[in-house]
Amino acid sequence: DTYETATARQADRAFFVRPGTDGALALALLHVLEKEGLTDEAFLAAHVQGWQELKKDVLPRHTPESAAAVTGLSPEAIRELALAYGKARAPFIRLGSGFSRYTNGAMTTRLLLALPAAVGAWKKPGGGLLSSVPGSRAFSKDIVQRPDLRKNVRLVNMCEIGNALTSASDPPIKSLFVYSSNPACTAPDQKKVTEGLLRDDLFTVVHERFLTDTALYADIVLPATTSLEHSDIYAAYGHYTIQRGEAVILPVGESKPNWAVACLLADALGLDDPFFKKSEDDLIDELIASTDAWPLPVDKAALAAGLPVDLPLPENYKLDFKTPSGKIELLNPKEEPPLPDYFPAHGDDEPFQFISAPDARILDSSFNEREELSRGKVMELLMHPDDAEKLGLADGDPVVCSNERGTASFTLALSRRVLLGTLVSEGVWWRTYCKGRCGLNMLTSQRLTDKGGGSTFYDVNVRIERES
């Protein structure tokens, strides 16, 4: 990780790297695995495309010593980690999402996926790599998304909503409907997002349960139901588990679920397709029926009864690689470069790397409505004591972090949980709790990842000074 989290404190051994350098560490681990004879050559020959090329053209440049200069880990620590991983009975990597939130995030993903391939982890019970395995893959999403009803429309990346609302476009965005989101708080480049939301010619509707930061900019706020007030079908985020949920209370007041609002809008717009006459339960029934396409039979009776259902998996599912070659493609001629390699993240021209980490009390900006949070540690900034001493800063000082996009105020907390040169603030707090209504996303960028159009929330540098 990039700093000592609560999870790291529970570990037998923890390794902390500079933000955005996971790819350099992965290559050094592969270098050691190959040198120490800990690779599974039979698995590599049968199931991996490009190992020999990677070993010949890339790995020699990425020694533990070179990676130490990049990651901040010692060469000895890198070797220790490589040997432990290579000798494990069931080498397993659990990936979060933080490593991908840099401009080199996609490349880092390619490099991390090379590790279980190198040691043949996929063939071992309990071995492999897990990022996200949403149970929603069991459903046909076309049932709800209905691509056949859509005309060709412009798609706007949510990570670039600030630019989309403020730049001259043809046609310009004149209306904004916000649901299940709070972009005034959670979107990057908060200053630009706010500038867009303040436009006099932008008509904004927010469908919400609480008066969020975004709702404060709305022309109309529509009350939304909670999960207790509407039926739905749920898919686990990290398990192959799905479950039908029924409403347990009637909608409060005029609250309506997303689907009901969509149907009412369709009716008001004169859209008469039968799709918009279906109920939530109709759609849920169709989604459950679509699980017929899952590789093995799904217990529909249990689903209908509202029980959690684990999706059955084929015996060899871990070796069924969904690529053109049917192998793990370390070498992919369609990619540039064809072989994975490390390159630094973008960052900014400022001295400190800034990480906006999760806080266990909230999820993104959800649960900010809890009154006790306004009395807790909000907008606290973790800094290594040695860095603070050099700048003449003390624990508890009011400080300001700045870069070309904006500024945000914090209370300084000195801690050896963070690395030298790194600052960490936990939690995406409603701007109501932030000085000057400036949250930490004043500092984050609309830059996108190298593939996939993902966010780069952690690829940020700032300067810091005592607040006057």
Model-predicted regions and their roles:
Residues 3-88:
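Long, well-ordered, tryptophan-enriched scaffold segments
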Residues 23-27, 111-217, 225-233, 302-391:
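Extended redox/cofactor-interaction regions of prokaryotic respiratory oxidoreductases
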Residues 39-44, 92, 124-130, 273-280:
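Flexible, glycine/charged-enriched surface loops at secondary-structure junctions
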Residues 57, 79-92, 162-174:
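Glycine-rich phosphate/diphosphate-binding loops that line cofactor/substrate pockets in enzymes
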Residues 69-73, 96-103, 181-183:
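Conserved short loop/turn motifs at secondary-structure junctions
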Residues 193, 199-203, 207-210, 244-267, ...:
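Phosphate/diphosphate-binding loops
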Residues 252, 258-302, 371-382, 386-468:
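Long, contiguous, secondary-structure-rich segments that constitute the structural scaffold
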